[in-house]
Swiss-Prot record:
The keyword Ribosomal protein applies. The N-terminal domain interacts with the head of the 30S subunit; the C-terminal domain interacts with the body and contacts protein S4. The interaction surface between S4 and S5 is involved in control of translational fidelity. The gene is rpsE. Residues 11-74 form the S5 DRBM domain. This is Small ribosomal subunit protein uS5. Part of the 30S ribosomal subunit. Contacts proteins S4 and S8. One of its GO terms (biological process) is translation. It comes from Staphylococcus carnosus (strain TM300). The keyword Ribosomal protein applies. Disulfide bonds: none annotated. Transmembrane segments: none annotated. Belongs to the universal ribosomal protein uS5 family. With S4 and S12 plays an important role in translational accuracy. Located at the back of the 30S subunit body where it stabilizes the conformation of the head with respect to the body. GO terms for molecular function: rRNA binding; structural constituent of ribosome. Pfam families: Ribosomal_S5 (PF00333), Ribosomal_S5_C (PF03719).
Length: 166
């Protein structure tokens, strides 16, 4: 039980959306709830999960468990991203631009939840295309996953980090 308590303290969770869905059967409609949850440690690890159940708390619990199984590590430089990037998923895309210290997180709804829980404190973002919460979350995570720091770019180009900036 002690390990579970440590894990609970390590990650912060944020419910992005809760949706009531219906299955139409002969006798009428059967309602269930879906939950979209983002979890992160504010130190560069973030993930999302979805859960479905007949009760809201149970759906949230399932979503949190799913999110903890699929965490992404984010490259950060002084509280922002190393470079501008566009994350895409389906017909939704999210533009992420690094910002100067003190700018804060300029993002809407689902994108804000992902960025804050990833530990990014200064960033500009713009949601383009589809604004479905799950598409926005996945597009944001796609962008964050594809970020490269200066060392990785230098290695890909066969140069030193100093040569990149000159």
């Amino acid at each position: 039980m002690a390990r579970r308590d440590e894990e609970a303290k390590e990650f912060e969770e944020r419910v992005v959306t809760i949706n009531r869905v219906a299955k139409v059967v002969k006798g009428g409609r059967r309602f269930r709830f879906t939950a979209l949850v983002v979890v992160g440690d504010k130190k560069g690890r973030v993930g999302f999960g979805t859960g479905k159940a007949q009760e809201v708390p149970e759906a949230i619990k399932k979503a949190v468990e799913a999110a903890k199984k699929d965490l992404v590590t984010v490259n950060r430089v002084e509280g922002t991203t190393p470079h501008t990037i566009t994350g895409r998923f389906g017909s939704g895309s999210v533009l992420l631009k690094p910002a100067a210290p003190g700018t804060g997180v300029i993002a809407g709804g689902p994108v804000r939840a992902v960025l804050e829980l990833a530990g990014i404190t200064d960033i500009l973002s713009k949601s383009l295309g589809s604004n479905t919460p799950i598409n926005m979350v996945r597009a944001t995570l796609n962008g964050l996953e594809n970020l490269k720091n200066a060392e990785e770019v230098a290695k890909l180009r066969g140069k030193s980090v100093e040569e990149l900036y000159n």
